[in-house]
Amino acid sequence: MRIIIDGDACPVIDLAESIAHKFNIELILFCDYNHDIKLNYGRVVKVDQSYQSVDMKIINFAKRKDIIITDDYGLASLALSKKASAINSKGKIYTDKNIDTLLMKRHINKKIRRAGGRHPTVKKRSKKNDEKFKINLIRLIKDIK
C-alpha cells in the first residue's frame, strides 16, 4: 500500500503526510514542474506541464491497494478500475457505487457552462473537511491493511 497524492492543487498535503508517516506508509506526491512542493516525509515526482500529464503518470504508477488522493473524478474512476482506493480532499471516499453519479454530474455541469449557464460552486473548505479527510483516510488505511 502506498499513498499517492495528485498534488497540483491539493489542500491536504500536510495532513496526508503526517498520517502516512504515522502509519509508516510510502507517500508519493505527483505535481508538474510549476509547483515547488517539499515534503518532510515521502517523495515528490515532478512531471511535464502538459494537459493531464500528472493524472496519466499517477494512473500508470498506481496499483492495487494504493490510496489516491485527488479531487479529479476522472482520475478517481481510473484508480478504482485498477482496484486502488480514492479519496478527495474533503474526505469523500470514491467507490464503484458513487463514481458514475459524480462523473454524470460533472458532465451535466460542463454542458450547463458551455450553454452559458451557471451551477452551484464548491463551498469554501472548513475544519470539518480536514477532520473528515483525516478520519476517512485512516479508515481506508485500516481497511486495506
Regions found by a protein language model. Give the residues of each.
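Nuclease catalytic cores that cleave nucleic-acid phosphodiester bonds
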Residues: 2-145
